[in-house]
């Protein structure tokens, strides 16, 4: 959890008692000459306990694979989904690169060896915050695109809008190669985990294989999940948008 504002106190002794009165009383505890002893004590009141509001903050673990700790508060608001995640699907061919904002990247290095299937696309279903834009470029232009995109702030994260030195502080993207195999055009075979940013579900025809390279800041949290977490999510994609590698989004019922 990331509290951005003070958590107030809901217990009061009287309806007209303010939070400032309560906190001043709390800070007066133990001081000489305090009138605390003359004030009525606030004991346990089951009804008051039931009607009050609570914020429970459970302790988390710190992992070297987490990238969430490198983001500023402004960036966290974009990286962490504030609404239910709606999967977005794209198709990539050999020699193309996917950028997820400026915090993750995927290159398709090689594809099926068969001439019949060498142009068959690799479908990726992206599970990440909608505030992280998706861009697809030719791999040979990827470095230039990333450099220009970060300077112009179109990638959104990392952002140098408030701190011009932010791009110098932000860890460079580092990559790791993975070999992928397909099982069906209607079922994802595996996931590429991108640390705290999200993951990519991989879908392609059975027997086809690809070599890809995934990137995250500092190369942290890159894993291949052998079994897709949501293997049939690829079927939620809409029709292919003509002339682009993007699929439309089907309407998803969220209760």
What are these regions (language model features)?
Residues 2-255:
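Helix-rich effector regions associated with P-loop NTPase G domains
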């Amino acid at each position: 959890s990331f509290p951005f504002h003070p958590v107030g106190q809901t217990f009061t002794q009287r309806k007209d008692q303010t939070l400032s009165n309560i906190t001043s009383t709390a800070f007066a505890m133990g001081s000489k000459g305090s009138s605390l002893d003359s004030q009525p004590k606030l004991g346990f009141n089951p009804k008051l306990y039931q009607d009050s509001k609570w914020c429970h903050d459970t302790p988390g673990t710190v992992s070297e694979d987490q990238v969430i700790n490198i983001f500023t508060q402004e960036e966290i608001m974009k990286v962490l989904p504030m609404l239910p995640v709606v999967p977005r699907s794209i198709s990539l061919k050999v020699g193309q690169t996917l950028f997820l904002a400026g915090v993750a990247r995927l290159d398709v290095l090689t594809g099926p060896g068969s001439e019949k299937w060498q142009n068959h696309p690799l479908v990726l279903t992206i599970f990440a915050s909608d505030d992280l834009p998706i861009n697809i470029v030719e791999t040979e232009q990827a470095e230039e695109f990333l450099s220009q995109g970060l300077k112009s702030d179109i990638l959104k994260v990392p952002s140098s809008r408030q701190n011009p030195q932010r791009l110098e502080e932000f860890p460079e993207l580092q990559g790791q190669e993975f070999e992928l195999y397909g099982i069906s055009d209607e079922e994802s075979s595996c996931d590429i985990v991108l640390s705290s940013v999200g993951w990519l579900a991989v879908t392609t025809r059975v027997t086809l294989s690809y070599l890809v390279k995934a990137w995250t800041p500092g190369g942290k949290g890159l894993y291949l999940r052998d079994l897709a977490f949501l293997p049939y999510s690829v079927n939620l994609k809409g029709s292919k948008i003509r002339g682009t590698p993007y699929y439309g989004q089907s309407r998803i019922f969220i209760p």
